[in-house]
Amino acid sequence: MSRIGLQQLNNSARNSPFGSEKATGTKQIPEPLKLTAQLKKYQPITPSPLASATTITPVLSPFDVFCDDDQEAKNVETQMFEYGTVSTQTIINVPHVQPKITEADLTSEKPTVNYLRVMADRLQMDLDDEMDRNQRLVAELGDLDEKMRKIDDDTEILLEVLADIDEEQQTDEEIGTAQL
């Protein structure tokens, strides 16, 4: 380790491209690349004559199309591209043919695939019916809760009116007994 001022340089700072530069305040300039035999095999590639024959120049507006030199810019400016997404949804209805249970399905030792399919279809239909019934009952319950809240509000109003009537009757009785 070496000390420069109050900063210490360790091996990692010396190996770092920035650590020693910060500490010493000097900037190291990298050496230029030397052409070796390995690098000489990488020669620049001359472009193809086909690529150099066609030059593409941009037109003035960013919405215009790039055109070749031999094409007129006047025609290019009038060209328009319309982009749009087109999606089609195909609904395929496959009629469900429920298999029939035969005597062999009922009398076999193990349940057959046909029997299990029929039972699964029946269970699915029962489940769908129960889900519909459940939705109806939830809607009815919501309506009943709303009616119950309205009845509670009406009851509170009636109780307040009765309390006011009782207070008026008591004050009338007190006034009537006070006058006698």
From Swiss-Prot:
Stretch list, region Disordered: 1-29
Protein keywords: Cytoplasm, DNA replication inhibitor, Nucleus
Any one GO CC term of the record: cytoplasm
Polar residues bias: start-end ranges: 1-27
GO biological process, one term: negative regulation of DNA replication
Superkingdom of source: Eukaryota
Subcellular location: Cytoplasm; Nucleus
Principal subcellular localisation of the protein: cytoplasm
Residue ranges crossing the lipid bilayer per the database entry: none
GO MF annotation list: DNA-binding transcription factor binding
Gene null: resulting phenotype: RNAi-mediated knockdown results in sterility in 20% of animals. Sterile animals have severe oogenesis defects and partially differentiated germ cells accumulate in the proximal arm of the gonad. Furthermore, germ nuclei in the distal region of the gonad are enlarged, and their nucleoli are misshapen. Sterile animals also have mitotic defects whereby pairs of chromosome bridge, which is indicative of a defect in coordination between endoreduplication and the nuclear division cycle.
Function: Inhibits DNA replication by binding to the DNA replication licensing factor cdt-1. Its interaction with cdt-1 prevents the cdt-1 loading of the mini-chromosome maintenance (MCM) complex onto DNA and therefore DNA replication licencing.
Family indicated by similarity: Belongs to the geminin family.
Subunit structure: Homodimer. Interacts with cdt-1; the interaction most likely inhibits the ability of cdt-1 to load the mini-chromosome maintenance (MCM) complex onto DNA and therefore reduces DNA replication licensing activity. Interacts with nob-1 and ceh-32.
Name by which UniProt lists this protein: Geminin homolog
